[in-house]
Amino acid sequence: MKIKKILLTSALILSTYSAIAQTQVIAHRGYWKTDGSAQNSIAALLKADSIGCYGSEFDVWLTADDKLVVNHDPIFKLKSMERSTAATLTSLKLDNGEQLPTLEQYLKAAKKTKTQLILELKAHSRPERETLAVEKIVNMVKKLGLEKRMEYITFSLHATKEFIRLAPAGTPVFYLDGKLTPKELKEMGCAGPDYHLSVFQRHPEWIKECHDLGLKVNAWTVNKPKDMKWLIEKNIDFITTNEPILLQEKVRN
């Protein structure tokens, strides 16, 4: 009986460890490659949550009138994100018929979900605009009670440092640009690298180095099964993909 209990306990421990160590799936711009969805739409967020993604990634800009909107490209339907007002931008339609959302609309919809919110602040034309954007994002997230579900990513080194400075202690902040070593990221206070797949193909040793330093590792945008398999075998923490269902299958297998 004692042996059975020991074996059962060991199995439970191993099972728990396995679940913790399992690579997590992040839907790139939400789950948009499905009916009724579009990149960076509220539908894409809800659909990412509905299929059980760990996280749903989305992109944020600060408009000319200091409002926050959700969109990827600097120009959408001939309108500049930085040079247009929020009223102009939110009048534009996404591919699924939704209007381009404000960050507030997006986050309010997110309150109905459980998925982690992976917010990418786009690199802006001036550092002071990025600082203002970070301040507004952090304040809005606090107001909506979503601090524990937020993770921040950005290509801007300045914005990375501002998120680390202004977000609550312990909030994961990842750098996207692929230029810093694990040691440099650790010294800066980052949660880890969120680099393009090609960076880890050049520096596969960085994944273990990050883990040895207590950092987490994310790779983007990984859509091919062979690349998913390679990263999973390297024990990467997160993979960002346009093919979340395919990646979920690879993680399970």
What are these regions (language model features)?
Residues 1-24:
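Bacterial Sec-dependent N-terminal signal peptides
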Residues 20-253:
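Phosphate-group recognition and catalysis centered on beta-loop-alpha active-site segments
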